[in-house]
């Protein structure tokens, strides 16, 4: 797991990636700590900062090896978690809420409802370990777009999935499939 980021403190890595003014330093540090629990401080780490409103580009895809922010985009939260702000989290089937914590991104699938998607394996017991059973996936959605925000004052909401703009799915699949990490941060 050696990488260019090995040995750097979270605050130095945060500064080198250039995340100031975009992603809170404490949120980045929490995501990095979660990845380090797995012994991983290399590869791709995506962080969804659910403390930001859904009108903000709050999904950050970071290459820890090259110390680069690769993607910053919109991400929806579950309809049971709130409207503009994600204020409630659940690991329970049928809650339609977002689950926080660390996920390992699995293989690409084709969802009958959403098209190309990525499986999510929740790694935090009691927080998100029911992700597969709940069918929580990264998928594209028409309700995740600047146009939807302009019409409704917020993004649409999923049934708990971190949904993104449909046209970004090929890029996210390339970056995250089969081993990338996703950290969902919330209060």
Model-derived features: where do they sit?
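Cell wall/extracellular polymer interaction/catalysis modules
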Residues: 2-159, 166-175, 180
């Amino acid at each position: 797991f050696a990488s260019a980021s090995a040995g750097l403190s979270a605050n130095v890595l945060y500064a080198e990636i250039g995340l100031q003014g975009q992603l809170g330093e404490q949120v980045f540090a929490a995501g990095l700590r979660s990845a380090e629990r797995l012994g991983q401080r290399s590869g791709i780490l995506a962080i969804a900062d659910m403390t930001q409103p859904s009108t903000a580009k709050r999904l950050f895809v970071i290459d820890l090896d090259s110390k680069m922010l690769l993607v910053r985009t919109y991400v929806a939260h579950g309809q049971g978690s709130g409207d503009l702000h994600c204020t409630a989290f659940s690991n329970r089937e049928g809650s339609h809420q977002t689950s926080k914590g660390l996920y390992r991104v699995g293989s690409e699938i084709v969802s009958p409802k959403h098209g190309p998607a990525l499986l999510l394996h929740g790694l935090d017991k009691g927080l998100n370990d029911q992700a597969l059973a709940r069918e929580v996936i990264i998928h594209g959605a028409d309700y995740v777009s600047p146009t939807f925000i302009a019409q409704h004052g917020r993004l649409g909401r999923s049934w708990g999935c971190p949904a993104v703009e449909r046209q970004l799915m090929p890029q996210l699949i390339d970056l995250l499939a089969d081993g990338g990490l996703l950290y969902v941060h919330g209060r």
